[in-house]
């Protein structure tokens, strides 16, 4: 049964009623436009249940012997004997614009001029303005529950100056309903192709149908059973067609989750393709993720910034003048929260400000939540972190006191706040403050670090972390030891890692205790936990790396490995994603110092180029590093054996490689091409080729392996494989990013016959 508002295809072959309806529409058009179209045949019929039936008929007609396609919209109410042509347009001459939104051929016909005047009158009444209509520049229409008209028009303002405006007008003709949804100043530069715009009614049947289509495609590809619930947000972008960005809720095995999909639509070709479909999280698209807006100076965002500046001027009796937007971020809350960094002049001096503006478009609601001076040259960011220039301003002292009070209450402690030493902030779902401060404990001054999560618009404040740092507060990116590895927070993290491992590997480890915990400030926090777990009744030592973003309720096991069992077989080599992480720089420096001492040399460490690790009874690190020898840069390789639980560290090998053999981008030969790691890579490439080409190659052996440091590692493998029992030589290129568990065959080709 047809859903109210939904478009449904109607079988039309050999049905005289649709021919008659099309002829009726042609006669109506000819009469109104003094034309001489001749109806030929119906091509397509859709219907929509409104207060009656709306028919969308696509048909062929000729004029002056030229055959073209037209579309007519005809409203029928049989009980009133009503038949009315609501829309009529040419669709065969590229007049159809992408995405369900179509250009109207005569923007200044009486009907559209009246709609534009209606929008201007509505604006004048609401804003006590005196705009006067001049002309329509462009009209587009979109089928919603009714018709949405997008009119770009020229009007003169109070000063007699001609300006460009955009109006969105929603019309339900059968109900005699007309509403101005939006009216705004555009300026002389109308938004260009490629801009992403919010769609006002994400659960309009059209967009629900698109979301259901994406879910069906995903279910079919992945053999899953998602069930659509609702759309949370829809954005659209004019491309060669229309790209829809839909955030939706769906049920997976009874659990509600959030997904994002990108759907490309070319309506005039009846083309629809799911470009992307991915899990976002259980709540990442609710009060949640902050995303960058691609065009911060689009008229919409400039208007928002001007609104914030005006609001500030009114409340502070100031005289700021808006210049431009520098950055715009948006966040889906109950409506949309915009974070705008803007430039404005104050008494002629250009300064930077930050504004937070809450918008609920469907209620015509707009409120400035926050407006503040950032500085004359905006603070440099450290990976999304911004230094706050005045750490002891009352606002930040109050935040710290709040954290100290909370800590005292939780720990039955008696810290007394002294002063803030440093404040950083990070835009998350709200703001995360990283405050380093001094406080006295039993009369002794100590250094602490706290993380406080604030959502101003919800009056929400939470201490995410509070810890003793000491006199050398850990810097961003540095790895620091945690003093109490078995506190409940870290035991819970370790159990989470063990459970994750058990699930993935079908194992049965049982957590016992933590031996050591380190943490590193990244975009969130990276925890390095050395733990004891029981495997088949035997105690073993494992290492887990867990990435936590508390403000997103995000927790992911990056790595879990056995390190402490002497029976462990020497294993595969693993690339380390961040070779210049302080931990690995310290190891490289240790190796250089050891070499200098043994050889009475004077090498000076510069940087790491590559780090690999190998699971043995402990860990062997293979570090390719740069050091200077008598002022000349050279490349060295070091092998360092580490057993962290014994505080054991030994340089097993240190040697000169060359002046450039290990530079990023340089290709080097791997000494053991048939080690299991490289055989596995070659098999992966062969399987990928077989799947794509419907081939039946069988891997035999590797002949040669080269590797190249890129954003990850590129492997160039020459291998032998049999094809219909004939041995041949192939070359493959495989990109590996171990830390993302990413592996992709870039190239696979036949080189020659192995028997020759």
UniProtKB/Swiss-Prot annotation:
Expressed abundantly in tuber and leaf. Keywords: Protease inhibitor, Repeat, Thiol protease inhibitor. Residues 3-96, 97-191, 192-285, 286-380, 381-474, 475-568, 569-662, 663-756 form the Cystatin domain. The keyword Repeat applies. GO terms for molecular function: cysteine-type endopeptidase inhibitor activity. InterPro entries: Cystatin, Cystatin_dom, Cystatin_sf, Prot_inh_cystat_CS. The keyword Repeat applies. The record marks 5, 99, 194, 288, 383, 477, 571, 665 as: Reactive site. It comes from the Eukaryota. A motif (Secondary area of contact) lies at residues 48-52, 142-146, 237-241, 331-335, 426-430, 520-524, 614-618, 708-712. Pfam families: Cystatin (PF00031). Induction: By wounding. Probably has a role in the plant's defense system. Belongs to the cystatin family. Phytocystatin subfamily. PANTHER family: CYSTATIN FAMILY MEMBER, MULTICYSTATIN. This is Multicystatin. It comes from Solanum tuberosum (Potato). The lineage of its organism: Eukaryota, Viridiplantae, Streptophyta, Embryophyta, Tracheophyta.
